[in-house]
Amino acid sequence: QDLPGNDNSTATLCLGHHAVPNGTLVKTITNDQIEVTNATELVQSSSTGKICNNPHRILDGINCTLIDALLGDPHCDVFQDETWDLFVERSKAFSNCYPYDVPDYASLRSLVASSGTLEFITEGFTWTGVTQNGGSNACKRGPDSGFFSRLNWLTKSGSTYPVLNVTMPNNDNFDKLYIWGVHHPSTNQEQTSLYVQASGRVTVSTRRSQQTIIPNIGSRPWVRGLSSRISIYWTIVKPGDVLVINSNGNLIAPRGYFKMRTGKSSIMRSDAPIDTCISECITPNGSIPNDKPFQNVNKITYGACPKYVKQNTLKLATGMRNVPEKQT
């Protein structure tokens, strides 16, 4: 281009972009190593190491599992009627009551976790002809023998244990969760001394379901001084339905029901400390920012979280291909 003037000077106009001394390597469909002037990391690869208590309501299980809190293990009484968005179970959690098992533990745990509440309503069950409120030295409540607070251990009265047949209708407009159990004595002598009959039976029914459990008498590994066990079961009673309990022995009866709710509550196993901070996304490793589209911290998440990927890094090129000028 000629410049105005009398000296016939010319200038050159260059179209292009600035190169940088040290570009960023990115992957493309056709090449694993392309250097560009600028790139943005898309993968969140670290956590804060702590769980933020805002905006989600975090309930720290401390020494209690969710199921122990549900049953009413004496050392978990502090959790009665609690609510949460995320229940955090710790590796140090332990049971400290009558040894038990839950045949479908994971399903019950998930059901209660998603409900987000341990709200419990006591009901007036009538248990005629039996002794109520059984306890054990394996389940101390203070200095005294105790039991799970949400369950009622029924044993013989005098020398009899009559057939029990109890009904409880659901006249409300929400689902009710009933927790009950079956006692498995360690010997035949223990069976008859508690329930008279040589073999008990427990049947729990609604219009939609029925469960019949026959106790398994026999010695098991000793736990807290006991070789007997309790198996825990549950029944959901829908509005308009009725709960029917029939038994001639070995029944661990419900004292009422847990009010079921629908929502997005959940549970997570983590030993990360809980802190006063704000984060929408929580993993077992701790909270993470959600300003990137991907994360590789943990597959398990709660809240509004980036999508999990296996890659440690994914970069988005935000600049042109970097071709520094070679000078001699």
UniProtKB/Swiss-Prot annotation:
Annotated glycosylation sites: 8, 22, 38, 63, 165, 285
Keywords for this protein: Clathrin- and caveolin-independent endocytosis of virus by host, Clathrin-mediated endocytosis of virus by host, Disulfide bond, Fusion of virus membrane with host endosomal membrane, Fusion of virus membrane with host membrane, Glycoprotein, Hemagglutinin, Host cell membrane, Host membrane, Host-virus interaction, Lipoprotein, Membrane, Palmitate, Transmembrane, Viral attachment to host cell, Viral envelope protein, Viral penetration into host cytoplasm, Virion, Virus endocytosis by host, Virus entry into host cell
GO cellular component, one term: viral envelope
InterPro entries found in the cross-reference section: Capsid_hemagglutn (IPR008980), Hemagglutn_HA1_a/b_dom_sf (IPR013828), Hemagglutn_influenz_A (IPR000149), Hemagglutn_influenz_A/B (IPR001364)
Principal subcellular localization: virion
GO terms, molecular function: host cell surface receptor binding
Superkingdom of the organism of origin: Viruses
Post-translational modification: In natural infection, inactive HA is matured into HA1 and HA2 outside the cell by one or more trypsin-like, arginine-specific endoprotease secreted by the bronchial epithelial cells. One identified protease that may be involved in this process is secreted in lungs by club cells. Palmitoylated.
Cell compartment(s), UniProt: Virion membrane; Host apical cell membrane
One Pfam family in the UniProt entry: Hemagglutinin
Disulfide bonding pattern of the chain: 52-277, 64-76, 97-139, 281-305
A biological-process GO annotation: virion attachment to host cell
UniProt keyword annotation of Cell cycle present: no
Membrane topology classification: Single-pass type I membrane protein
SUPFAM superfamilies per record: Viral protein domain
Role of this protein: Binds to sialic acid-containing receptors on the cell surface, bringing about the attachment of the virus particle to the cell. This attachment induces virion internalization of about two third of the virus particles through clathrin-dependent endocytosis and about one third through a clathrin- and caveolin-independent pathway. Plays a major role in the determination of host range restriction and virulence. Class I viral fusion protein.
Subunit structure: Homotrimer of disulfide-linked HA1-HA2.
Note: Major glycoprotein, comprises over 80% of the envelope proteins present in virus particle. The extent of infection into host organism is determined by HA. Influenza viruses bud from the apical surface of polarized epithelial cells (e.g. bronchial epithelial cells) into lumen of lungs and are therefore usually pneumotropic. The reason is that HA is cleaved by tryptase clara which is restricted to lungs. However, HAs of H5 and H7 pantropic avian viruses subtypes can be cleaved by furin and subtilisin-type enzymes, allowing the virus to grow in other organs than lungs.
Similarity section: Belongs to the influenza viruses hemagglutinin family.
Protein name per its UniProtKB record: Hemagglutinin
Organism of provenance: Influenza A virus (strain A/England/878/1969 H3N2)
